[in-house]
């Protein structure tokens, strides 16, 4: 098609030249819209009604939104005309209130329909969602036989997926406390698993050499030469969050994030301020933050700075501007570490609703939805179970896997499989098959091949839980991106293959083609771990004491001093911030160690919530606390106050709160936004919690403001400014 004619009729992508919609600025097209709309509707009915799967054809991706926009336009006109006619009748009958009510409802309905007629993409989404509502998600049965690999394996050792399992790492009984509590997970056992998979992935003999190998190989492939990490280079760690902590909805395990930071900061000596831990679609990171921040205070937690527009291009269907934006942490990173969960995203149902979920699984692929500015426009393309899709159809996850700033910038793929999530917002389930034997999965996986690790995660979940139909469609597309079953010309097609996909031989032996020596597919390598090795089962501090428990140790030391008991409670009597290091020893050598930092703070100023200036949805309760009582998307509120600081320097903001609505707030200091993550965990029975956040304050008067956008919050009692006692 002639370029000028194409641009006259259509809206095109400025980079690829692809048609992405109608040119709404064209005056002639605006005038002739009813004719074009009617033609599009007729074309849609003729083509799609006899064969619904045709809705995914490129021509229908353009025609359908125009057709339904036309329907919305006509409906808007008719509703508007009918409303006005009814209003005049009531007004002349002197039924003023009834007439005004009819007019208001009519304007609202007509306006909504008009907006949908103008926004083709919105109309398309609504129609497709309504078509899927109430339909059967089907059940997944692989179309490819076991051990028939497709695609080209990637990695230092192609196709290798390292797997570590230690049943004692996840020690939660499923009832007491939270899965994320420090006494429910062994930090040192998690450390051993994390170290084991990284070493096994590279076949090095020490963890520092293993990370060096990862950095050198990555940089060589990026054209930088086989060089190590250089001080100042930025690392983005994308974790998976759906909750804000304080509940048993499974998110990134705090102990897992701690272990990764321990390797990067303590072993590889990477500056803390060069690391960002984030999920840009979930502002709350409190459970992870509360556990990790005292030891690694200078890491950037969720301060990702918003999104960079027009970074991502999609190969089909998706044109939304927000969906094309990328989290700044990912955009600016020299290295991405994709740290996902082992999660079934949707529980298959024969009557689908949006709350059931969109895709079959969430692992390293869908994890990156948390790096995208606007996610809902992506949902249609990942419903591979839909009657309008199926195997051999476009899936936007493939575009993210191939993107130079996302999959193309990933140093290593990790899967935190301490607890498996049966649904996108679900609680942990136990696995029945050996070696789990009705226990938690309590595992870690690592790979340089994203398709391979996704395939392994899918096989693990499918062996225990049913999945919705066509669960591995995106893996078939990714493995064959150069010539995919869908025929889509993916933007990353020049890569040929994004990795290797296959299914294991059976859920008992879990053997892939490289394990069997029958092909060049996946190798699942299990890291050998002795459950009876010396370990610290837990080590944590509360306000008054240190709590610890060790196992299989010949000797236990705290800050170099021998302890007589393998477990115990040690009263705290300290006046300043203190580091505590617990070690287990065997044959005179340290076998495991864990560090805990206990802060001591001195209050500089105390501000009662009742004395703060309140705006919007901020309400004062009878007990003197302030609570934001707006609904999602409907209101905003804030509290502000002033503090007088004696000296310029580093301080801590200490928020005392209570309640079961753990939604974080924005923090502004002297008009400048400092954080979008003043977070709160859920508390119960009136128990109060504290959130501690480091802030830099100027000498003299500083104005602080907590802003809460549009959702209910916990109750805030006091906000103190404190100085650390060192």
Report residues per predicted region.
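Extended, low-polarity segments enriched in aliphatic/aromatic residues
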Residues: 124-231, 242-247, 251-532
């Amino acid at each position: 098609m002639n370029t000028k004619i194409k641009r006259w009729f259509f809206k095109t992508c400025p980079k690829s030249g692809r048609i992405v919609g109608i040119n709404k600025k064209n005056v002639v097209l605006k005038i002739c819209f009813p004719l074009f709309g009617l033609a599009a509707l007729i074309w849609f009915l003729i083509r799609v009604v006899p064969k619904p799967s045709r809705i995914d054809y490129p021509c229908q991706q353009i025609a359908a939104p125009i057709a339904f926009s036309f329907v919305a336009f006509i409906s808007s006109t008719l509703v508007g005309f009918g409303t006005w006619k009814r209003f005049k009748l009531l007004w002349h009958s002197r039924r003023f209130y009834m007439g005004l009510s009819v007019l208001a409802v009519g304007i609202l309905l007509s306006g909504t329909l008009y907006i949908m007629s103008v926004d083709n993409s919105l109309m398309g989404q609504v129609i497709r969602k309504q078509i899927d509502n109430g339909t059967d998600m089907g059940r997944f049965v692989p179309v490819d036989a076991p051990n028939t690999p497709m695609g080209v394996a990637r990695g230092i050792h192609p196709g290798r997926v390292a797997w570590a399992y230690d049943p004692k790492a996840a020690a939660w009984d499923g009832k007491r406390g939270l899965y994320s509590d420090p006494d429910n997970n062994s930090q040192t056992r998690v450390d051993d698993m994390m170290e084991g998979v990284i070493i096994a992935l590279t076949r090095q003999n020490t963890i520092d050499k293993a990370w060096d190998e990862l950095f050198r190989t990555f940089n060589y492939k990026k054209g930088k030469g086989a060089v190590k990490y250089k001080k100042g280079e930025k690392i983005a760690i994308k974790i998976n969050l759906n909750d804000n902590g304080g509940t048993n909805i499974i998110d990134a395990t705090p102990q897992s994030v701690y272990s990764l930071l321990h390797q990067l900061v303590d072993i590889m000596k990477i500056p803390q301020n060069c690391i960002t831990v984030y999920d840009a679609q979930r502002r709350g990171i409190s459970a992870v933050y509360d556990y990790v921040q005292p030891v690694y205070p200078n890491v950037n937690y969720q301060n990702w700075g918003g999104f960079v527009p027009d970074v991502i291009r999609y190969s089909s269907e998706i044109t939304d501007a927000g969906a094309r934006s990328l989290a700044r942490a990912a955009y600016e990173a020299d290295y991405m570490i994709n740290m996902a969960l082992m999660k079934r995203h949707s529980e298959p149902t024969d009557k689908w609703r949006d709350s059931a979920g969109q895709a079959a699984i969430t692992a390293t692929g869908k994890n990156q939805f948390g790096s995208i500015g606007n996610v809902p426009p992506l949902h249609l393309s990942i419903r591979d179970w839909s009657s309008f899709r199926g195997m051999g159809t476009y899936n936007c996850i493939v575009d993210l896997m191939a993107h130079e700033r996302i999959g193309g910038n990933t140093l290593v793929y990790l899967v935190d499989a301490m607890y498996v999530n049966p649904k996108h917002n679900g609680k942990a389930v136990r696995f029945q098959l050996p070696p789990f034997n009705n226990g938690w999965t309590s595992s870690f996986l690592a790979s340089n091949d994203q398709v391979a690790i996704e395939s392994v995660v899918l096989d693990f979940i499918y062996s225990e839980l049913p999945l919705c139909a066509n669960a591995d469609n995106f893996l078939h597309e990714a493995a064959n991106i150069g010539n995919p079953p869908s025929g889509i010309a993916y933007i990353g097609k020049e890569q040929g293959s994004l990795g290797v996909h296959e299914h294991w031989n059976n859920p008992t032996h879990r053997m892939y083609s490289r394990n069997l020596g029958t092909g060049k597919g996946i190798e699942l390598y299990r890291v050998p771990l002795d459950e009876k090795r010396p370990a610290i089962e837990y080590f944590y501090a509360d306000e008054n004491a240190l709590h610890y428990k060790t196992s299989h140790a010949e000797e236990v030391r705290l800050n170099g001093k021998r302890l007589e008991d393998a477990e115990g409670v040690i009263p705290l009597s300290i006046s300043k911030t203190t580091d505590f290091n617990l070690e287990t020893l065997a044959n005179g050598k340290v076998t495991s160690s864990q560090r805990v930092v206990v802060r001591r703070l001195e209050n500089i100023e105390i501000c009662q919530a009742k004395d703060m200036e309140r705006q919007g949805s901020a309400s004062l309760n009878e007990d003197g606390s302030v609570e934001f009582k707006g609904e999602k998307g409907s209101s905003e509120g804030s509290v502000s106050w002033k503090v007088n600081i004696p000296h310029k320097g580093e301080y801590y903001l200490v928020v005392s709160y209570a309640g079961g609505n753990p939604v974080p707030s924005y923090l502004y200091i002297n008009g400048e936004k400092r954080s979008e993550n003043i977070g709160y965990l859920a508390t119960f029975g009136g128990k109060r919690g504290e959130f501690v956040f480091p802030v830099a304050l100027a000498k003299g008067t500083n104005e602080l403001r907590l802003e809460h956008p549009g959702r209910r919050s916990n109750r805030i009692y006091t906000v103190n400014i404190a100085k650390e006692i060192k």
